[in-house]
């Protein structure tokens, strides 16, 4: 079978398996020269059933320290994943953005945009995204991540494209499209190659985030965007495959960017060749620091436990694990989730996270990585 190599040959029904991009190796896409940004799904901690705003600010400053030390561009993702997005009212959503902007007036952020009030709808309505878009667009220097929703996701490719375009035409800020596999929610379907190509050509969509457990869609996206030179940045949402995005010189947009922040920032820098101007800590050999491979192992083994699947085969409780990690690092006062959050770990989570952190805590001082405890 001749594989598709041109966007002109794509049809709405074309599966990835019919394209050359589904068979492109990670090795052929390796990039040792680009220090892409790290987008961290910032935790809104709670204390005594109320938002811990001091802990929120303290955790952001800690991550800024990590980024500054290694010269990594960091963007904070608010109201998604570790922000307990599905439990925030519009009022608390707006307050998170206001407080962040007041404390960090020049810091870029991405904010998750979900459909509101669609629970009883029988068909997709783009205006359901407008309330949070309006709140977000009160702020400058931010991007909008258009989170997938059931009624958006179940549309056929052409109707789904039209829906994304309706949303894109409403926004005034740069937007990021968000895709999931059914391994995360049962109704989710990743973008077909035709749909990805269509979204990538809309001027408001500067990139997309894809999260998968079973099929390497981030690799497909990366191969297509590089081959076709699309003005669209694939962002990896794969907390189970963090090293891949670093190796490809592409952005990460992950909850693991919080708990493993100094480790990931260090890896970003170590992967670069000495000849790259942005490299902060050069090897003196002209090459990259091959010790990064052991760092990859250390932070992935750690995050595999943070993101371990529960009895429902869901990784959603990782946000509770993240709170335990930040608490053990002395950054927040309590490992407490949002009071309405149902995705919780067990009573032994503090011990489990202590065990999970042993290897990264061992390797961090050996590689001179600061900000990760003793």
Give a label for each model feature:
Residues 3-29, 34, 39-45, 66, ...:
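C-terminal alpha-helical cap/extension of soluble enzyme domains
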Residues 52-59, 92, 96, 125-128, ...:
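General structural feature for long, well-ordered alpha-helical segments within catalytic domains
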